[in-house]
Amino acid sequence: MIFLFLLPFYLGVSSYMMFRFFYWMKHCNHRFNWLRFKVPFAVVYLFMALSPVIAFLLPKSAVAIVIRRISTYWIGIMLYSLLYVVLFDLLRLIAKHTKLKNTLLFSRGSVISIGSVVVACAVATCLYGIFNARNIKVNEYSVTVNKSCGSDKHLKAVLVADLHMGYAIGVDHITNMVEKINQQDADIVIIAGDIFDNSYDGMDDPEGIKAQLKSIKSKYGVYAVYGNHDIDEKILMGFTFDWGGKQLHNEKMTNFMKECNIKLINDESVLINDEFYLVGRRDTDKPGTEDGTRAEISELTKDLDKTKPIFVLSHEPDELQKTADAGADIDFSGHTHDGQLFPGNLTIGLFWENPCGIIKKDNMYSIVTSGVGVYGTFMRVGTDAEICSVDIDFAG
């Protein structure tokens, strides 16, 4: 319900941005100050600004899906437009209290020039963010586990997470991801949650996506856990609304995963080829259980043969010390998106011990991916969409 408190602020910011645009346009040409321009522009602008709310209120339909997709771009456009406008307004405010206040900096020509720079910067940033979000990179890691893995001296695991299949991420993006995965010649593929984007019905082509996911190639198969967005909930600009109901996993989602030949391991462990364990954990915030809890990692590993490699798959990179103490050799996670958008990429490290990349916790490696998809807005600025190819050597 936080968004209900932020809604007046959002509407205020949206109004401020509209009037700043009008201010710039009337300096560019007096005709832009005519009602015949301002009224149509205001109607279109207000539709865009309210598109997240409109999509939220509409019942599920093709129209609602289109409007929600529009809103995924609008959120980013608003963010960076606001960032640049506020930046230049602050600079002008500072200049107003210096010797520059009586210079050409405050002339009509300056208003036109500065406004043009703001628009150009916002457009360039958003276009870069959109294209960068579509470009899935391969990030490679190499680790050594001091255990024996049967006849395997080497294992290649491909980690993906945060697909967020739905209104923003469709079959084209998933096709790109699968192509990247299959190029790695993986022994095992693991998906660390947020496979869906809070809605099964938001997918543009479920059968097409299913065909792509079924085509993933690996020696030991594909395993996954659910994340906090693998719950069917109403979502508005990143804020979810459960209306007090139980946050259980959607049966459609689970059946879809089975049909894709993806094995869900929520709070369970599997011994693969009698050589290594893969332990899957439910999500911390939204485990999808009747009582809203998940099993402790120590409970999941207590009966395992600790002489064999133990890999943990958890959506959020939390409880790293507990996971290391429980005997895990590698903890695979996602969730953070590495901040996804500047300046979030600069502050994400304040909230997570390992926001993205690889660290070592005692004898355990923590590997966190920035994810394949996006959340909120279809942009990535300062971060990359990625899959992680992890080469594991065994020295036992």
Predicted regions and their residues:
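Non-catalytic terminal accessory segments
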Residues: 1-134
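Short amphipathic alpha-helical coupling elements at transmembrane boundaries
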Residues: 65-69, 143, 176-179
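Alpha-helical transmembrane signal-anchor/signal-peptide segments
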Residues: 133-148, 181
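Soluble catalytic domains of enzymes that build or remodel membrane lipids, polysaccharides, and related
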Residues: 147-396
